[in-house]
Amino acid sequence: MENCMIRNTGYFLTIFFLAFISFAVTCSGTNQKDNVDRLPVVYEDVRIGLVVDMGSMEGKLVTTSISMALSDFYHVNNGYRTRVSVLSRDSHGDPLQALAAAMDLLQTEQVEALVGGQSLLEAKNLAELGEKTKVPVISSFQVPSSLSLAKYNYFIQATHDTSSEAKGIAALFSNFDWRTAVLIYEDDDDWRESIQPLVGHFQQNAIHIEYKAEFSVSSNEECIMKQLRKFKASGIRIFVAHISERIANRLFPCARRLGMMEEGYAWILTARSMNNFQDTNYLAKEEMEGVIGFKSYIPLTEELHNFTLRWKRSLRLEEVVTRMSVCSIWAHDIAWSLARAAEVAKLPGLSVYDLLEAIPESAKHKGLSGDIKFIDKKFISDKFEIVNMIGRGERSVGLWNSGSFISNRRRRLSSTKALETIIWPGGSTRIPKIRSLKEKRHGKKKKLRVLVPAGNITPQILEVKTDFKTGVTAATGYCIDVFETSILPFNYEVEYIPWPGAINYKNYNDLVYTLYSQKDKYDAAVGDITITDNRSLYVDFTLPFTDMGLAVVTAKDKSMWIIFKPLTLSLWLTIASFFILTGAIVWLIERHDNADFQGSCFQQIGTLLCFGFSTLVFAHRERLQHNMSRFVVIVWIFAVLILTSNYTATLTSVMTVQQIRGLKSNENIGFFSASIAANVVNDNPTFQGPRYKGLKTADDFTNALRNGTISFIVDEVPYVKLFVAKHPSEFVIVETESVTNGFGFAFQKGSPLVQKVSREIEKLRRTEKLKAIENWWFQRQTTSATSEDTFHPLTVYTFRGLFMITGVSFAFALIVYLIPWNREQRQVVLKHFHRYVSHRFAREIRPSPTTPNRQNENSVI
């Protein structure tokens, strides 16, 4: 029993000892693991350079937003091997200092990406630097999407879709039936370039920009008031403003003092303007009551709310900002995309320059600004909120999205014409209407300032005279008559302003550019202005009121051999051959029984030829006795009748058109050296080959055609018609080519008169009043031989069917005639052959008895 207890005690001691050893080892391993866990983790640093104006509110907001965004990102993704660190530099708002700061970051800090570009020039400089150093440059500021930036492969931009915004503003105008507006924008490259999409969509939707005004940051109140008084006097009530907050804080108080923030007016602000506004100037906000603005749409989410609260707490007390700007929200999303891209780019096997390629894939996430779209190196925001400024705040009245719906709770402008109620300036809810003050003056005509080229050398087309005593300019001519007839229904008083430089094609380009660049001085241009593609970039043209294209003129042909021109030589020879063949066949049939076809050899040849050619005038005197000869003559007379009728018709055409000749490569062609024809003949393949000579006046044309120096004249159709009308007996229009677009009236881009005048021109053409005006000034209808009227001689191929029928008929007559003759001749030949064979056979059997005697005589001799 005692031994058993001793054994059990030893057993338990052994187990206890082993358990103790195991526990000690376990504790030792745990301590080692804890020591390992407490070792510092090494992250790979990815340096990003930030170049902003630290003194600007926007620069401060973006810097704070990026810092907080990276902190939040790595708090959520603490397992990432990389950490993005931001190294900031102050650009002080100077593009050159921004470039120097970026170069310093690249050289001293070896940053792998740059964030910055608060202006267009600054963005271009950084983009050029990034292109040379192969470092991505990202801009979260609202720099316009310029074509000059699109060429940089390493430049990435966060921006709103200006094209979608322009469509939205144009749709807003259509919704309220507005067709004219005043465009106010900031006099700066950034703002000037970013307004171009809106101008283009206004033109496409026939919305006329009545006036444009540029205000710079240095513009004082006196300058602004002067422009606003001009707009108020014009009667235009709809304004579109594309300006920064600094200019807006001066513009709207001035507008209110002039009574332009009262009922009947409408002000629309673009997205770039609204996105940059901060809630710092409450008095300026109150001055903007009733304004409508487009803003980049930022969805109200819990994440945005929480981030905004923490962001406000991070600001210093002196920085009073109630909400984040759009740029700072975009900067937050860009920071998250950069952090994701840095992790992907630093994976084993990838180079440091793969950061650019990793950004598009890393941008596919939902940020504070909503679903991020990365299209063509741009973070695109294409959703816009339409807000109405009320008091010190703003109220959403609708959404604009060129794609799909954003929310079912709000109305979308693209799906319905009804927005929520808008409080317009003056507290009115009635939609402002376009009513020009000039239209309110009962019976008084509106003035239309029209440029006319004073140096025209063709008074029938346009002539400008100025009375130096009164200073009044009068214009007459075909172009003026058409214009005044077209503009008559619209109650305009036309003031003609002479343009002294219009003496050649290039100066006409200058005339068009003057109309484009001096919109406050001129409304339209009238004259012999050819519609061209490059001119259409600057002005809007009406429908052409003249024939389109160039015309070719030549002298009328007065050759004495013109009677032979209707038929080709081969056809003349073929007809002559058939005349002789007809006489020969008739002679062959009639010569045995008809005494008229008998006689000596020369008499028979003369009869054969006279009979054949006399069928041309149906005057043959010989009486025919055989039916086959009569058949031959009837068929040939039928053919002659067809040939003579076609010859007569063709000769008539020849005498009318006067043998119009085609252009040959060895003939000289003249053109007016100062007209558009000088450009066209050198560029168009239709006129390649001939030698061209530039002439200066109509007298030069006349003399050159008369003495043969040139064979043809090429010029625009109206000039050619006028030239031929002066010399109808000498010259004729040969051909026309539609290589120019004719003359048109030029108006300012977007002018509503373009469509109205075009409709009147079409009405004049349909009622033939346009033709009557042309005939009045050109004296008579010009004879024109177009390509359809140009003479083409008749050929053998034209009458191949007729000659085939005639030939078959002649062959048939010969065969019928020769069958009985062959029978008689065959009998005679057989008879003679039989006699010859019989005689020959008899001589071989019975020799003649006289043969031996003759042989003996020969031997004796």
UniProtKB/Swiss-Prot annotation:
What sections of the protein cross the membrane?
569-589, 599-619, 631-651, 801-821
InterPro entries linked to this entry: ANF_lig-bd_rcpt, GABAb_receptor_plant_PBP1, Ionotropic_Glu_rcpt, Iontro_rcpt_C, Iontropic_Glu_rcpt_pln, Peripla_BP_I, Solute-binding_3/MltF_N
Pfam families attached here? ANF_receptor, Lig_chan, SBP_bac_3
Q: What's the chief localization of this chain?
A: membrane
Question: Any ranges marked Cytoplasmic in the topology annotation, and which?
Answer: 590-598, 620-630, 822-861
Record-linked PANTHER family? IONOTROPIC GLUTAMATE RECEPTOR
Q: What is the protein named?
A: Glutamate receptor 1.4
**Species the sequence originates in:** Arabidopsis thaliana (Mouse-ear cress)
